[in-house]
Amino acid sequence: MRKSRLSKIIQYKLIEHFVSGSTARCAADLVGVNKNTAAYYFHRLRELIYRAVEDATPFAGEVEVDESYFYLTGYKGGRRKGKRGRGAAGKVPVFGILKRGGQVYTKVIPDAKASTLMPIMQERIVPDSIVYSDALPSYNVLDVSDFHHHRINHSRLFARGKNHINGIENFWNQAKRHMRKFNGVPKEHFPLFLKECEWRFNNPSPQVQLKQLKHWVKKHLI
């Protein structure tokens, strides 16, 4: 990765604003750089995050799985609307896996078919884990898999004891709330923004986020 031409001081100031959740335009005004410079630097930070989080280890124990849909350019956030799966026109489908009490993993998917979701679950979830899902038919394959499957029917029961997927749905809400501030995310950059949200969720401490970014920047950009 090519080194940045920005001074170390400017880079660290931009990192602090990135961690705080500022937009590139706001950070540019506060640091005193061109808005395009700040936007490009934020893009490079997201590239570093993307590379780092892809090395996540598989989850074991109690795991929640769910799919959600994101608007891109013109994105307005909010909860799922309209049809799911192939009928979700104008939206990008994303699959998420969350270990209860732990971390989340996300992946942009072409569709929410069983043939798409099952290989991801087999790669990212340890066999014999307990998997909670909603009633989407694509998850029926879990009934004859190496996982212990519990299905939640939202129309009849939202949450009772451990029988829920509140954790992954909480992540969706956080991710969409974060992306709303950008007033639209280009399709080609959406995976980077998604992994940024994943990273923030998995590392909720700003101090930890700052430390990790400075470490990666020192290694790759300075």
Where are these regions (language model features)?
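Residue-level recognition of single "structural anchor" positions
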Residues: 1-222
